[in-house]
Amino acid sequence: TSANSEFKEFANNTTVSFGRRSFWVIGILATTAFCLILLLLLHLVFKNNRPVSKAARKVKIQKPSTTPEQNADEAITPSDIIDYFLNIFRLQIGADPDAPMKTKALMDNASGSNTVYELRIKHHGEWMQRRMSIGPLGDEAGSKSKCYYVIYDAHLVVKIPVNPISEFEYYNKTIKKEGQIVDKLAPKECIVPRVSTIVRMVHKLPGSEHLPVEQREEKYVSWLRSKTKYQKYLKIKNTFVFFMDFSKYYFLSHIIDNLHDVKDAMAQEIMENAETILDNQKFRGRYGKAKESIGIEIEQVFDQCQAAVRQFLIDSGVSSDVSLFRIQTWFLTHLAGKSVGAKEAALPENLVKELNLLIELTLSKQMEAVTACRNTITEYVHKIRFEQNKPQMAGIITNLLDLLAWLRTRRIAMRDLKPDNLLVAGDPAKYPLFLMNPDEYELGIIDVETAVDFEKSKDGRIKQPLLGGTPFYATPSHFFSNAVLSEAFDNLSKILHLQDWYATMVMIFKAATGELMFQNTARFFADIRNKIKSGQMEGMLETEIVADVSRAFWRSALMEFQTRMNQKENQLRSIFLTLPDTCKKMFKKVLSNDILATTIKIKRCINNQTAFGSPQSRQRLLDSSPARINHLRIEFENKVKSMRRPSSDLTDAIVLLKYLRTLKLHVEQQNQLLIRLEKQVSRISAYILLGFMFNNLYKSMFREEWWVKSTAKEKLSDGNVDEATLQATV
């Protein structure tokens, strides 16, 4: 009992004590909280009332961090872009956010141009509709943003950044950064992303439409900072997207494709010359005697087709009394690669479908003759179109060279030049006639994302551009940092400029032929990153990796260049252009340097050899013309043939003479070209131009000491490489 009483007394005392203590603790905590709140309110009032410094006003801009997994999951597709513009349409008509919406593809042009879509939204009980089109621009370049060509209210280029951008200030900073390159390229036409391009479609700021472009842009940027909810209209899925207005311009890629696209012209040739194609004598007269057998074969194919069609009409209960002209038209429609429509056939729809299948089946059984006929007509049309379009091709090449020279003058390397990234600026009222005269239009830049200013900054450095490029227009140097390129080459600025030189050369070939020059060599880029990584893992020096990659690339490029030049020699020699003055100045400097370097090489070669030892014979070699050197070589070869055991000195002399002739002939040709450039008006063929450009690239970007591996047991003769390069320039 006493223990129980003692416990109760202890418990009672503890409860009373704790109650008193808790009262004081709660009071202290409440007082402290009140003081903290009061101090916070005073701090906020003081902060809002004091003047804001410039440093405080400045918005902190941070580059958003993303992971490859995020990019893969959130990749933006054409469907996402279509949905985006469907929502823009909803905002424009004022429909509810939950209004029913539909999209439908109307046509897909097989030539690769935009797909047209119909956008439909139910508003006030009625379906509102409009159209838009979308298509990809260019080849994916790995490290570069993806672009689409969209027509919606205006012609737009929509650029999706590689890494999602979530912060508006970083997005705006990126736009301004591109503007710095554009300012330096002025007055060349360039288009850059602008927020006003798309925002003004859903909200027009009062008085902004009559402002200069830059002022209007600043007004929209300020408005978006204050009205942050509108920033979402610059986003697709999780990222801000760049929008460029292309309404005033034309794509160079579309123009080049149209110059060489003979598909429609072939169909027109077939449909307009029915009597010629189905009459062997007339076929021979139009397409040449060598094609006579093809004319006979296609006439036989038509006879088989006509019999099958007439039997089909009888079996279908249709009068067999169908004119020969109608059946010829149906046959020629399929020969042109098209199908007969219900209106043209004047038959029930189900029969038209069967008719098309029947004609297609008949042609497939004689596909060899059909293909030969199509190829003959295509070749004929291409030849006619080529002659008609040569002035436009020459004009494009002239303006490509003018752009290249301008980039060099402004010390800018675009590093991803290609037809899809170049605009054509001319008077729309005169299109396409202005293409006949290069002075009536100019080429400009669509996207400057990969560009770099190679004029050294105050600290003597050149900014590091994005690595990577479009394989058909890029060199291995696109994949190495400035630091590595500076170590591998003597002149980083020159290498950056030559990246544009290479792309321009490829575009010149495409403008003249409609084809890519280095399709096989471009495949090296699929493995180039792996070679770089494996080289690093093996502990190779960066310069050794550059040499290894360059060796494989340039050997392939040299062989492919020679092959393509031989294939297209007649076409390329027939296109003449007048070199712009800016380009002549650039070319003359290159030629002078090359002549000097080759002359030094000749002297070094003669001094280092042992076959001709006396000072007199060496001087004679130095003074001799290529023809004299060649004559001497023939004498030595005849002497070797007459000897049972010729000495090694004789065989060495023959190798030396071959090499000397190559070098001297190269100097002679370069001097002739230099003399031509000194004239007030310098005309040159596309063939000579391409040879000169490739020669400079090969010697500048593929160093002589890289021609063979240092560990190779057998060193190739320098003459073999120089001879091959020379053949490409003859």
Where are these regions (language model features)?
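Short beta-strand micro-motifs within the conserved protein kinase catalytic domain, predominantly
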Residues: P193-K237
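Conserved short submotifs of the Hanks-type protein kinase catalytic core
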Residues: L234-F251
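ATP-binding glycine-rich loop module of kinase domains
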Residues: P136, S143-P212, A265-I298, F302, ...
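ATP-binding glycine-rich phosphate-binding loop
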Residues: D73-L156
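Activation segment signature within eukaryotic-like protein kinase domains
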Residues: I396-I397
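Conserved activation segment of eukaryotic-like protein kinases, specifically the C-terminal portion
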Residues: R461-E487
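Helical subdomain adjoining the active site within ATP-dependent kinase catalytic cores
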Residues: E74-P78, D279-K343, T513-V730
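Catalytic-loop of the protein kinase fold
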Residues: L404-N437
